[in-house]
Amino acid sequence: MNKKVNEPIIIEFGDILNLEYIELIKNLNIELIKYILYSRNQCSIPVNQLLSEFKNINNNNNNYNNNNYNNNNKIKIPFKKKKFIESLISLFLEIDEIYFNCLDQDEELPIVVSVLLGSSIFNLKEVYIFYFGSYNDYKNGNNNNNNNNNNNKSNNGFQHDENRNKLREIMMKLVIESPDSFSVLQRPLKTNICIYKKINNITDCLNNIYNNNNNNNNNNNNNNNNNNDSRDQLFIPQQDFQLKIKKSTKITVFNFTNSNINDKFDFKITEISLKSISKNSDHINNENNTNSNNDDNSNNSNNNNENYMWYQFHTSINGVN
């Protein structure tokens, strides 16, 4: 049977994750992005090797600077390659900040993380979607790996080893089940990362982003890679998750839930949209608050609809080879 236009390739991971292990989820996102960039020919060697070489070169050059050696002995990194690495480092810091805020402020984790490859955000060649589902689903027993340990968010040695083993298991499965399209080389493209999540206080958050972006515009030449707070993220004011695509856009979904992806997403010829997560949350709220009156439930529904947003990271990555 011929594959339908924009029919996604779905790699099923089931309930392999526990969304209370925030460090694992964060590291998984970063490793998946690294894997996609290398597999899709956006860099000529694995990302970890690239970052290691970059670090060694910088250390070597710093030694020359500190000892006043001849600058001719310093190793020069090609501009595009240097920009690629610096963008990666900046992006990973931004991702780290998102998940740190989830832990520090007890926010829900992103429901969707998407990796977008194209000549621009409006001309996408390939879309990769990591679907994690709502944290409420996990709290209500849909994740078999969940437990009642109140210390799940702690980073003890045992948990560190378990997370590392789980990450290795996921990456091995991904290598084995990678789609055939990965065997076809892709030319260097621009990579953007978007996430869809619930924001607890959307008004304050948007005001902070607006003010920080204004400050950034006034200080464009003073960009610092270590500045990884909210000013490095660009909000897209759109409640529904939608990606504009082409008929030729290739879609791959990594499903980290037991849900049927087609029950969660609408895959159309020109767009990908996420079906209402807030309805699921409302259903859970109604079950847990049976004594609430209809007005309260209506207010909860409105709040859920307003608080779910998706946004695009400020940092984009231009592929090199």
UniProtKB/Swiss-Prot annotation:
Region (Disordered), start-end ranges: 280-306
GO biological process: regulation of exit from mitosis
InterPro entries in UniProt: MAD1/Cdc20-bound-Mad2-bd, MAD2L1BP_domain_sf
Transmembrane segments: none
Compositionally skewed regions (Low complexity) per UniProt: 286-306
GO cellular component terms, A-Z: nucleus
Protein name listed in UniProt: Putative uncharacterized protein DDB_G0286405
